[in-house]
């Protein structure tokens, strides 16, 4: 690897860490807990056997079965795991241009990974030849005098790399890759040290990783303080190895998980609710730094690596979890849908919720959505954390509601079709600037369902509490306590432009012109009021500045808007 490529990889990694910091978490305790479970429950004699078979020049179906069986045993013992999740990316948080970029890069990544797994070695294409074919080819090449190109002995110089001779190559998928908990357990057990010694050694390695990618010289110096690190093999490739190998990559990944507050990419957890936001942030860094999918087969660069890991499973710990139960590859498990535009469609008065209900259509939350809301944990909101709330519209007829927690960056944001159209048009002109047809696709019943799901005796902070209090009381939530910061209009909105500049992509519903009447006559155009943006700017006003953290939407889009037109049941 050239020096320029190392610098670029480091820059890409650091920039991705900054942009995705809001999706990172502290997982040291969970990793150590899984390592303890492996130390007590895993058969390390079988671990030793799998390490042995991974050193073989050729491996067969029997070897693969042993690897898969041991991987399944590990999967059964740990809690950090990714689950099978088919993700479909559509226009919403991601723009149509974003989707085109993702589709193209996933296709390039597919091509690169395919070429890497069937590599060129010393100029000779191996293909997917069986052991018998490789032996036959070696004999033929020896016969014609090409003994140094494609012999079957040890070492890469003879043109033969370690190969799996198996009937079904798909069974190899997702059986490799490293897990910090497994690396930690293997170092502890096979290095015959205390678990805490291994944790301390990996923590120091992780601290170096926050500034640069550790190399063999760094490891040698660190091994003087932590002899257990002598087990790490810096010459071992990170390609096509099992989680039981002591590669430098495996140790560095484990070290990243030992840091609390390091904003390491290895600690990202993806869910159906956060996937679009994560990909949006990745594309932002790609655009600013010119990141790309390389045509050269081999190890993945930071952009290729995070794109593959996020798209492999839309539910779980993308870098560090057990993924042995996942079927398929990243480009199979994440599909880009360029056909459907999921923005709320202007379908006219005939498509409003009231018209649908009068025509006999079922308009409202379906059972699975109600069950999701019933468990407040699904909100990802912390019950006792500072929570802002704001509404647009009248308390008896709200059209937009937002809840925002600055500590986590999580927010709930949804809309409602108004019943008083005349009052709505007045409010649109002087406050929120919405088009009523954009609200016809709003999911009915969501306001009551969300307010009902809020924890009892919750404390909510707001700027102006009267309307919010009336709304909560109308839903029977007198137990919720309100803190009104009562700032002046100018003070509460002093970060308005900064908030809209930074977070404008979070809401596209304010399309109209809003005016404000002046005391001495005349009118002046102002920025439309958005419940979510107001929550963010009110918090900035109280805190004295705007936090640059990444915000995470809680409610999936299909819960906020109806994504398809109901059908009449005949």
Curated annotation (Swiss-Prot):
UniProt-annotated location(s): Virion; Host cytoplasm
This protein's UniProt keywords: Capsid protein, Helical capsid protein, Host cytoplasm, Host-virus interaction, Hydrolase, Inhibition of host IKBKE by virus, Inhibition of host innate immune response by virus, Inhibition of host RLR pathway by virus, Interferon antiviral system evasion, Manganese, Metal-binding, Ribonucleoprotein, RNA-binding, Viral immunoevasion, Viral nucleoprotein, Virion, Zinc
Gene3D superfamilies named in the record: 6.10.250.1200, Arenaviral nucleoprotein, C-terminal domain, Arenavirus nucleocapsid protein, head domain
Top-level EC class as recorded in UniProt: hydrolase
Documented EC number(s): 3.1.13.-
Residues that coordinate or bind Zn(2+): 400, 507, 510, 530
Site (Important for exonuclease activity): 467
Molecular functions per Gene Ontology: hydrolase activity; metal ion binding; RNA binding
Purpose of the protein: Encapsidates the genome, protecting it from nucleases. The encapsidated genomic RNA is termed the nucleocapsid (NC). Serves as template for viral transcription and replication. The increased presence of protein N in host cell does not seem to trigger the switch from transcription to replication as observed in other negative strain RNA viruses.
Protein family per UniProt: Belongs to the arenaviridae nucleocapsid protein family.
Description of how the protein assembles with itself and partners: Homomultimerizes to form the nucleocapsid. Binds to viral genomic RNA. Interacts with glycoprotein G2. Interacts with protein Z; this interaction probably directs the encapsidated genome to budding sites. Interacts with protein L; this interaction does not interfere with Z-L interaction. Interacts with host IKBKE (via Protein kinase domain); the interaction inhibits IKBKE kinase activity.
Protein name: Nucleoprotein
Organism (species): Lassa virus (strain GA391)
Gene (UniProt): N
């Amino acid at each position: 690897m050239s020096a320029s490529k190392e610098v670029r990889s480091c820059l890409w990694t650091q920039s991705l860490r900054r942009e995705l910091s809001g999706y990172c978490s502290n997982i040291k305790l969970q990793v150590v807990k899984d390592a303890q479970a492996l130390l007590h429950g895993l058969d390390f004699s079988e671990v030793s056997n799998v390490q042995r078979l991974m050193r073989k020049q050729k491996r067969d179906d029997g070897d693969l079965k042993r690897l898969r069986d041991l991987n399944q045993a590990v999967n059964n013992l740990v809690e950090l795991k990714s689950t099978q999740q088919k993700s479909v990316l559509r226009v919403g948080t991601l723009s149509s241009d974003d989707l085109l970029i993702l589709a193209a890069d996933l296709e390039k990544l597919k091509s690169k990974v395919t070429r890497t797994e069937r590599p060129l070695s010393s100029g000779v294409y191996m293909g997917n030849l069986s052991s018998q074919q490789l032996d036959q080819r070696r004999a033929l090449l020896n016969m014609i005098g090409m003994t140094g190109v494609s012999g079957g002995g040890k070492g890469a110089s003879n043109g033969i790399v370690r190969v799996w001779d198996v009937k079904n190559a798909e069974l190899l998928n997702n059986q490799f890759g490293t897990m910090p908990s497994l690396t930690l357990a293997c170092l502890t057990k096979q290095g015959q040290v205390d678990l805490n010694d291994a944790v301390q050694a990996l923590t120091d390695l992780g601290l170096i990783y926050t500034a640069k990618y550790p190399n063999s010289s760094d490891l040698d110096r660190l091994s003087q303080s932590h002899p257990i690190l002598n087990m790490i093999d810096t010459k071992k490739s990170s390609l096509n190895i099992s989680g039981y190998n002591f590669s430098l990559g495996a140790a560095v990944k484990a070290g990243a998980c030992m840091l609390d507050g390091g904003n390491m990419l290895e600690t990202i957890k993806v869910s159906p609710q956060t996937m679009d936001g994560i990909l949006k942030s990745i594309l932002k860094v790609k655009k600013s730094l010119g990141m790309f999918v390389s045509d050269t087969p081999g190890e993945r660069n930071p952009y290729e690596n995070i794109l593959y890991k996020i798209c492999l499973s839309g539910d779980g710990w993308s870098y560090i979890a057990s993924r042995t139960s996942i079927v398929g590859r990243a480009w199979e498990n994440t599909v880009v849908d360029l056909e459907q535009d999921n923005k709320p469609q202007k379908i006219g008065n005939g498509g409003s919720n009231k018209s649908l209900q009068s025509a006999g259509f079922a308009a409202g939350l379906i059972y699975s959505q109600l069950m999701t809301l019933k468990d407040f944990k699904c909100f990802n909101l912390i019950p006792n954390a500072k929570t802002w709330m704001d509404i647009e519209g009248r308390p008896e007829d709200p059209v937009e509601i937002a809840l925002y927690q600055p500590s986590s960056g999580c927010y709930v944001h949804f809309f409602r079709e108004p019943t008083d159209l005349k009052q709505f048009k007045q409010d649109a002109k002087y406050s929120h600037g919405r088009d009523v047809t954009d609200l016809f696709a709003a999911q009915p019943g969501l306001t009551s369902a969300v307010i009902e799901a809020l924890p009892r005796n919750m404390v909510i902070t707001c700027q102006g509490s009267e309307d919010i209090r009336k709304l909560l009381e109308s839903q029977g939530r007198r137990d919720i306590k309100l803190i009104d910061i009562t700032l002046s209009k100018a003070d509460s909105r002093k970060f308005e432009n900064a908030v809209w500049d930074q977070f404008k992509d979070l809401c596209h519903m304010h399309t109209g012109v809003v005016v404000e009447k002046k005391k001495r006559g005349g009118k002046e155009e102002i920025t439309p009021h958005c419940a979510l943006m107001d929550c963010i700017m009110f918090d900035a006003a109280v805190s004295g500045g705007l936090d640059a953290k990444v915000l995470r939407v809680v409610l999936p889009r299909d819960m906020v808007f109806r994504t398809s037109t109901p059908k009449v049941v005949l």
